[in-house]
């Protein structure tokens, strides 16, 4: 540790430069990762927060909640088996400050309602609970809104946490309000557990299918289209990080060959030199990534609620671990070089 720290202090400018590069790369990785997660949550946060493992939907080639049309006969048969009421969605356009915004209206059994950030669940026919993202349009509990093509005013009774599906904010309504507002609806059944007997019974109902959450998210076009390029960008940045660290530490090692030779000649073991190099890689990487995380955390605090950005601590921890692994991979050439240094050749004894 002492050897590693002394070397960092002696070559402070070089190590500051590599920390700055890691900081910039780390900031880019964390920001793009946060953007990817934020966009993902805008697509599937409703599904992620739903206490259900299975969904009973219309039997289509590509099952989607918004296109699940179950007739009354199918609903009656399903409800006799699972003893649950249906969840229904309807697409509407909300008028906000003279602007139109597409939203999804929702009516669902009480135990499946999204959690509230503030306010109360709608009880009256003229009350609604809105997704938290809509508060970015200066909406709050107590405000009234209208839907395009309708003249009724609806009072906001509550704000729901993370309630979005396919980039559309969700609006919770009671059964009567939902029916009076929506003429075209999609119907499905979120179910937590389905036993073997119920699965067999459901298979006998024509035109329905039991799917899991992944089957639904895979069929959200915007989810797949956004995640793939963003994840490729993150992978590319990790590759760039490995190349940069590899080049930096390899050049540093070549420049230090005479010193390494002298240290070996006076009895310093190779494992101590490798340990010093390892500690330098860990220290420079950790400092750069922690600084990047701090800056992104500060930026996140000032981002508006409408910005699709999200970073979890587990995600940040994973990024730090990946950066360390990438740094070690990038330093493999330096490790090999240190191992091969011959003290006599390094200090010019063979000339």
Swiss-Prot record:
GO cellular component: plasma membrane
Primary subcellular site in the record, as a coarse category: membrane
Entry keywords, A to Z: Cell membrane, Membrane, Transmembrane, Transmembrane helix, Transport
UniProt KW Signal keyword: no
Alphabetical list of InterPro entries matching this protein: ABC-4/HrtB_transporter, ABC3_permease_C
TM helices/strands, residue ranges: 16-36, 232-252, 278-298, 316-336
The UniProt record lists the keyword Transmembrane helix: yes
Membrane topology: Multi-pass membrane protein
Compartments where found: Cell membrane
Free-text function comment from the UniProt entry: Part of the ABC transporter complex hrt involved in hemin import. Responsible for the translocation of the substrate across the membrane.
Stored PANTHER family: ABC TRANSPORTER, MEMBRANE PROTEIN (PTHR43738), HEMIN TRANSPORT SYSTEM PERMEASE PROTEIN HRTB-RELATED (PTHR43738:SF1)
Quaternary structure and interacting proteins, as annotated: The complex is composed of two ATP-binding proteins (HrtA), two transmembrane proteins (HrtB) and a solute-binding protein.
Family, as annotated: Belongs to the ABC-4 integral membrane protein family. HrtB subfamily.
Name used for this protein in its record: Putative hemin transport system permease protein HrtB
Organism whose genome encodes this protein: Staphylococcus haemolyticus (strain JCSC1435)
